[in-house]
Amino acid sequence: QKQIISNAKAMADEFQRQGVRVVSGGTDNHLMVIDISLFGGDSKKMQDELDKVGIYVNRSAIPFDKRPPYYPSGIRLGSPAITIRGLKEKESREIVRLIVSLIKNIKNKGIKNQIKKRVKEIVKKFPIYEDFQW
């Protein structure tokens, strides 16, 4: 449980370093919500694009959001799934950098392909089960 929170704190810190606002200013638990309003704010599209590269998040409303409830400006994500695989703070920060790269380059297919390739490398290095294929 300590590693789950350590990974979440590393992720929140890395989002802020990358210029993405964490809604609560950080996290004290396994979850965080980031504000993507500076990057177009369409969390439905962002969720779909992240799904395509193997990173799973959820849309989330944020305080004072000007966007409609089905297309809010927030993305909610957490650290339990990556921590269960054995990822630590270093890899958690890398996952954030991949997310931010996709957010900032949403229309660039080449970058999205690079991100998908890197995600596959990470999950292969940190499998759920020894013989699990992704």
Task: Describe the function of each predicted region.
Residues 1-9, 28, 41-43, 109:
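Structural signature of PLP-dependent enzymes
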